[in-house]
């Protein structure tokens, strides 16, 4: 063997050793992977709190935890933010869906819609859904919403300060939140075209200026207006106009985690899945979490991690109930079927899954989109009865794509009665649960959804977009042969062909069913908390991102401020 060959083998072996020791646990300084089966590296030993999940909720919790002076370890299943550069691009939402930042799952067949299945897109990156979503930042119909759920301590006036303190908007200068948002300019030709199309169909609803969020604070959520997006944009003045010159996605990671990643009380474990929570003999105190972590070579190891004060599950409405059920907290019948010892029989864990049924059709636009914005050309919220005094139950959002100039038209039904559920597929935590979104399981939803869809089609025709074969036109399937002549059947055909999840999952660990809204504790436990969108009893009318930030901040003040 020549010396050059020996040298090559030596270099390859050295590179493999280095690669196998690449970090899976970061605090901004690339901490090395956990050693030992008990997470007994001094960097991770005995934090005050373990936070499971680094999405919108977990990011807020970590920031609040540090501000209250506690030592916290955040465990995140997904990859590092820097491992997938496309997530930073405001115009890259479409590209993200085919990247390593997402996990794709197929839902349980929907017997109400001819056994249709949907694709669920889950985040696989720190920052959670805020790193992969469409970047729409809307307060939603919070006044009506919190009045309807009617939980003491969670009125509109109780939560409003938290909503206001999430964002940093030029239109709300007295509130300097962590999440920078940018609103579409009213002079943007794409918004001008959207406004004209909306006004022709909905003469009774009003434009919300200077943006939807700010205007809605002064009364009445229904309307249309310049959308705010979670994009940090830089502008330069040209004459009297502010012209955007650069922008990046303002995810939960960038807003909350990145600024504190080097804090001495922060430890972050990436590529680390919490398999279950272990309890004391009485089944009342959460003692530790079992973690499976992965290095950059893909090798798995297991460890355990204890917390002095509490364990907070913030893995989202799809994964938090999975962890609870794997831990023996959930419907006893379901757990017994799988042979999981029941710690606490809680029938509502994984139930009441709410979402927004969405029909997405794609057209070719006329006005080009930008490479440095989220390209949300407009959004509107209304009641299908076209009454500005009625609570909105439908929305239309237009999402553009830089380059090919495609326009995704999102027709979103926001007030469904239907509910779904989540069940474990097996006792293996690596197995994706069974997700049943339950769209249209309550037939009362079909009528309003059909009428709302008809209205959005009128808006689309006014925009004069160009249809794209296979992506635009609704084709009547064999089992609905005359769908073109019936509004309800036409909507069902459109949903069957172009139906999607709204990705607005809530309800699976709901307040007053699973979680005490006064403490954030799972009922029956003294240090096991749930803080994420799963605690919403129903999906708010609109996107869930800002709402999740807000309720997480309120719960964080309750949890950390009362110790």
From Swiss-Prot:
Q: Where is the signal peptide?
A: 1-21
UniProt xrefs under Gene3D superfamilies: 3.30.410.40, FAD/NAD(P)-binding domain (3.50.50.60)
Q: Where does FAD bind?
A: 48-77
Q: Which residues form the active site?
A: 504 (proton acceptor)
Keywords, comma-separated and alphabetical: FAD, Flavoprotein, Oxidoreductase, Signal
The coenzyme or cofactor needed here is: FAD
Family statement: Belongs to the GMC oxidoreductase family.
Protein name (record)? Putative GMC-type oxidoreductase L128
């Amino acid at each position: 063997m020549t010396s050059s060959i020996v040298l090559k083998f030596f270099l390859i072996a050295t590179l493999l050793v280095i690669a196998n020791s690449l970090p899976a646990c970061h605090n901004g300084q690339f901490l090395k992977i956990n050693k030992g089966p008990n997470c007994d590296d001094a960097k991770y030993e005995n934090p005050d709190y373990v936070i499971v999940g680094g999405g919108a909720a977990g990011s807020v919790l970590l920031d609040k935890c540090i501000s209250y002076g506690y030592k916290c370890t955040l465990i995140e299943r997904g990859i590092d933010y820097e491992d997938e550069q496309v997530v930073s691009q405001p115009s890259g939402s479409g590209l993200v869906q085919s990247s390593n930042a997402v996990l794709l799952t197929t839902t349980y067949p929907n017997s109400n819609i001819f056994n249709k299945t949907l694709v669920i897109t889950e985040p696989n990156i720190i920052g959670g859904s805020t790193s992969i979503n469409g970047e729409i930042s809307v307060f939603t119909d919070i006044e009506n919403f919190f009045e309807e759920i009617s939980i003491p301590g969670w009125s509109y006036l109780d939560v409003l300060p938290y909503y206001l303190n999430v964002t940093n908007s030029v239109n709300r200068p007295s509130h300097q939140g962590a999440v920078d948002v940018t609103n579409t300019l009213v002079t943007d030709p794409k918004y001008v075209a959207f406004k004209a199309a909306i006004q022709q169909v909905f003469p009774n609803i009003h434009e919300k200026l200077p943006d939807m969020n700010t205007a809605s604070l002064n009364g009445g959520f229904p309307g249309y207006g310049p959308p705010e997006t979670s994009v940090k944009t830089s502008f330069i003045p040209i004459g009297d106009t502010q012209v955007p010159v650069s922008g990046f996605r303002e995810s939960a990671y960038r807003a909350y985690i990145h600024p504190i990643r080097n804090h001495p009380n922060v430890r972050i474990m990436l590529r680390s899945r919490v398999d279950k929570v272990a309890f004391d003999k009485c089944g009342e105190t959460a003692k530790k979490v079992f973690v499976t972590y992965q290095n950059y070579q893909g090798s798995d190891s297991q460890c355990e991690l204890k917390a002095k004060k509490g364990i907070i599950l913030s893995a989202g409405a799809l994964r938090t109930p999975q962890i609870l059920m794997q831990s023996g907290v959930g419907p006893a019948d379901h757990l017994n079927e799988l042979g999981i010892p029941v710690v606490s029989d809680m029938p509502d864990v994984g139930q009441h899954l709410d979402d927004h049924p969405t029909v997405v059709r794609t057209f070719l636009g006329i006005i080009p989109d930008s490479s440095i914005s989220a390209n949300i050309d407009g959004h509107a919220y209304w009641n299908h009865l076209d009454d500005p005094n009625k609570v909105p139950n439908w929305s239309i959002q237009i999402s553009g794509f830089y380059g090919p100039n495609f326009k995704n038209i999102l027709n979103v039904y926001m007030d469904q009665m239907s509910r779904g559920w989540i069940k474990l597929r097996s006792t293996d935590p690596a197995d994706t649960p069974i997700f049943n979104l339950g769209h249209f399981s309550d037939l009362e939803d079909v009528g309003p959804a059909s009428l709302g869809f008809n209205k959005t089609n009128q808006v689309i025709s006014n925009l004069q977009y160009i249809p794209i074969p296979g992506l635009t036109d609704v084709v009547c399937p064999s089992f609905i042969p005359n769908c073109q002549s019936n509004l309800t059947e036409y909507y069902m055909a459109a949903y069957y062909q172009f139906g999607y999840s709204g990705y607005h999952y809530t309800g699976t660990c709901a307040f007053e069913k699973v979680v005490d809204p006064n403490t954030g504790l799972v009922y029956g436990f003294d240090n096991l908390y749930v803080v994420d969108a799963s605690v919403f009893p129903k999906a708010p009318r609109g996107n869930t991102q800002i709402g999740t930030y807000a309720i997480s901040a309120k719960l964080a003040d309750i949890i950390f401020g009362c110790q």
